Swiss-Prot record:
GO terms for biological process: translation. PANTHER family: 30S RIBOSOMAL PROTEIN S16, SMALL RIBOSOMAL SUBUNIT PROTEIN BS16M. The lineage of its organism: Bacteria, Bacillati, Bacillota, Clostridia, Eubacteriales. The keyword Ribosomal protein applies. This is Small ribosomal subunit protein bS16. It comes from Clostridium novyi (strain NT). The keyword Oxidoreductase does not apply.
C-alpha cells in the first residue's frame, strides 16, 4: 500500500479548511484515510497550521510520501528540520 501525507478539503464553499491526513494514494482526495495528523486553515489571518510532529515524523520514517503542499507546510511548521536529521 503506497501511503501519502496529503490535504483533505473540508469547510464550506469558498471557505476551505484542510485536514492533514495519512491516506492510501489510490483513495479519493476526501475519501478514506488512515490517520489525521493535523490541520491547515488558509483563510484565517495569520494562516493556522497545526501538525502533530511525532505522528508526522513516524509516518515519514515508515515510508509515507508527503505531497508538495504538505512538504511546504512541514517547512513552515518547522518539522522539515527535524526530518532531515
Amino acid at each position: 500500500m503506497a501511503v501519502k501525507i496529503r490535504l483533505r478539503r473540508m469547510g464550506a464553499k469558498k471557505a476551505p479548511f484542510y485536514r492533514v491526513v495519512v491516506a492510501d494514494s489510490r483513495s479519493p482526495r476526501d475519501g478514506r484515510f488512515v490517520e489525521e495528523i493535523g490541520y491547515y486553515n488558509p483563510i484565517s489571518e495569520p494562516k493556522a497550521i497545526k501538525i502533530d510532529e511525532e505522528k508526522a515524523i513516524k509516518w515519514v520514517k515508515n515510508g509515507a510520501q508527503p505531497t508538495d503542499v504538505v512538504k511546504r507546510l512541514f517547512k513552515e511548521a518547522g518539522i522539515d528540520e527535524k526530518l532531515s536529521k
